[in-house]
Amino acid sequence: MTLEKARALVAAGVFCLAAALGGGARADQVYQGCAQPGPAGKVWYLDPVNGKTPAAGGNGSQTAPWNSLTGVLSFKFPPGYTRPLLSSVPYFHVVDGKRVYVADQLGSPPVQPGDTIMLMSGNYGDIVIGDYLQQVVNPSFVTVEAARGQTPVFLTLYIRSTTKWVFKGIKVQSLFGTNNSKLPLVTVTDQGAALPSSNIILENMQVSSADDTDGWTQPEWLARARVVGISAKGTDHGANTTCVSVTNSHISKVIFGAEVMANNMLFSGNEIDRFGDDGIDYVASNILIAKNYIHDDQVLGNGAHMDGMQGYPGASSNVVIDSNRVIRQADPKLPFPTYLQGIDAFDGDWTNVTVTNNVVVTSACWGILYASVHGGKVINNTVVADGLMPQPGNCTPGVVIKDKTHQGSSSSDVIIRNNIANGLSIYNLDPNMTMDHNICLTIKGKCVILTYVGGKPKWGVFKPGEYADHNIIERNGAAGMFVSFNPATFVYDLRLRPGALAIGAGNSAEAPPVDITGAPRAGRVDVGAYQHAPLK
């Protein structure tokens, strides 16, 4: 997908929602060009508490539900099931006197691709889709969904080498080591180019190590919490797991929130909180990370480098990060608060990266930072220090483009524009590097704008005033800019207050057409993530 198309999707507030799918079909949020579920097939019911096996009279109806999801989806079907009830699942059986491991219609399996499986409340155990060196190929989407008013629970969900699944409204929860499993709570992966995965939709998932971690000590956190909430990770730098979408889900009480490491991936509308390392780790091509809320990270004593979103080593292209909020601490009762870098990539090599409309409130040196970025746009973000945790050298979160990472080449063709931050820096010795129409928000009367002259950093720009390319160091700090900014009570309303210097001070070139709320940027463009509107 081109960068322009990605931004257009963000501007519209939708992500390839099907406009007319036909009778019975619904629109799901997926990355542009990925498959959508078609018309719905039959609906089946499972109940792990009151259901029965087929042998005992269960027929999958609402009045006689089956009792095992494993019996429907897995080659390891339990007693009372003579084969997987879903026809696309390979399994061992005898055909024409020979033992084979294939998917077929032998025995008239009732569940077909295109059908929906409704789950009643109860514990379904560890759910595994796919097998070693085998692939489950669905020509149409199979939907596994919580029935209305029900809370089905999986211990883990492991999806590999398969196609076309929707999981919706499922709670996935277990402690680290449950059933000897150290896997992420939810995994989507492949087994190489010959056994890929594609078109996996996860919607409205509730993913956590436990409901309540209050009272856990830091060692107990490290011993009990799952290492990763949701992991979508393809081999060959994301190429063999594609078209994964994770939307409107809640990931909580884990060490790492999510891994966005599959090509053509959408990660949108999710909340990640109470985590002990990074909120989102990402490295892939054609990914859209939008409208997520990441907050309340915790220090657990394991030496973690804390990041809201961190880019990983590898070559990535066509990355859009738009309209996210990264708030270091929103809960006054958070047990182990700590610093949190915002949105960054210290490693890897990045081509066509757009970072727009994001809000970062933190105690850290880096609010938004990239290096080895080529064709980058960091536009209309708001990055401010909460001032609650002193940092080495009294650094404050800024918007920064550096020269290069450990693995990548020097940055080129990058724009820093229309941002509000407590510091601004660009390695302008690289070709086609632009920094204009930004506002440097003072703390105690100072804010540093760092550029390079003759190969050396120019440190002397920190006093209020207007500098080159309409970059402004303002005088009044956060109190003069935002509707409400009160770190003492963890209240951060970063809309622009009437009369704020940022109103109308932006550059319309390359600015996103809507702000973080979806409001249009019509006429004069404001600086920061929010376009000003009269308060109601």
PLM segments and residue spans:
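Right-handed parallel beta-helix/beta-solenoid
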Residues: 27-99, 123, 481-484, 488
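Surface beta-loop-beta hairpin patches that serve as ligand-binding interfaces in beta-rich domains
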Residues: 28-37, 68, 83-112, 456-458, ...
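Extracellular beta-strand-rich solenoid/capping regions of secreted or surface-exposed proteins
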Residues: 99-118, 124-143, 149-200, 222-239, ...
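Extracellular beta-strand scaffolds
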Residues: 124-125, 150-155, 173-174, 178-179, ...
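Predominantly extracellular beta-rich ligand-binding scaffolds that present long acidic/polar faces
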Residues: 127-128, 323, 347-493
